[in-house]
Amino acid sequence: MTESSIISVKQSSPVPEEEDHHHHQQDSHRTNTKKRVRSDPGYRGVRMRTWGKWVSEIREPRKKSRIWLGTFSTPEMAARAHDAAALTIKGTSAVLNFPELATYLPRPASSSPRDVQAAAAVAAAMDFSPSSSSLVVSDPTTVIAPAETQLSSSSYSTCTSSSLSPSSEEAASTAEELSEIVELPSLETSYDESLSEFVYVDSAYPPSSPWYINNCYSFYYHSDENGISMAEPFDSSNFGPLFP
């Protein structure tokens, strides 16, 4: 083997290593591309955050600003939020993620960002059941029928006030209970009407003159300079009225 052939063999030996490195870079690029495609839900106006949540936003017409619609746990929720906002801002020309749900999505009272966000939140909470003819919100007590319902602050206040106001049956039962309340006797009843009771007088407020209760046995109280003295019970029918 000549010297020139040995040099040519040494120069050609590193070529396979470079080719292997090049193939490895291509494989890693393909893997990264597959990961990016896997994380893309394919819904319009929906993006995935690095921590696993899904966000939705929509651009306002003829403006550079965007309306933030919220962060959601699934891409379908974010897609429904985008559809509700798109129908409000772009109308019938909007490109929807779920065109079959267009008649079920809520309609805000105006196209202001706050009303659009409220409608998007309601649309995201909807769960369409193929066996049912209505859209049910995640709250089982609320059902939205397939109609163009307008959402506004006044409608929310109306629902709240109606749920808190008592029904006519409850009001009638309350009136019946009030009518059955027994009227208590007057506190201004004279001493003569309480013939079978003893009357107690506080020593801190002595009477100005002796007195008695007619036609009953009672204690006789007398006030003098030395204080209050109490005599034995007596039969008031044997004595006439006492005057100061």
From Swiss-Prot:
Record-linked InterPro entries: AP2/ERF_dom (IPR001471), AP2/ERF_dom_sf (IPR036955), AP2/ERF_TF_ERF_subfamily (IPR051032), DNA-bd_dom_sf (IPR016177)
- Which GO terms fall under biological process for this protein? ethylene-activated signaling pathway
Q: Where in the cell is it found?
A: Nucleus
Q: State the UniProt keywords alphabetically.
A: Activator, DNA-binding, Ethylene signaling pathway, Nucleus, Transcription, Transcription regulation
Identify the stretch(es) annotated as Disordered.
1-42, 154-177
Q: Which GO terms describe its cellular component?
A: nucleus
Q: Where is the composition biased (Polar residues)?
A: 1-14
The UniProt regions of compositional bias labelled Low complexity, in chain numbering, are 154-176
Gene3D superfamilies of this UniProt entry? Answer: AP2/ERF domain
Task: Give the Gene Ontology MF terms in alphabetical order.
Answer: DNA binding; DNA-binding transcription factor activity
* First-listed, main subcellular location of the protein, grouped into a coarse class: nucleus
Q: Its function?
A: Probably acts as a transcriptional activator. Binds to the GCC-box pathogenesis-related promoter element. May be involved in the regulation of gene expression by stress factors and by components of stress signal transduction pathways.
**Can you name this protein?**
Ethylene-responsive transcription factor ERF037
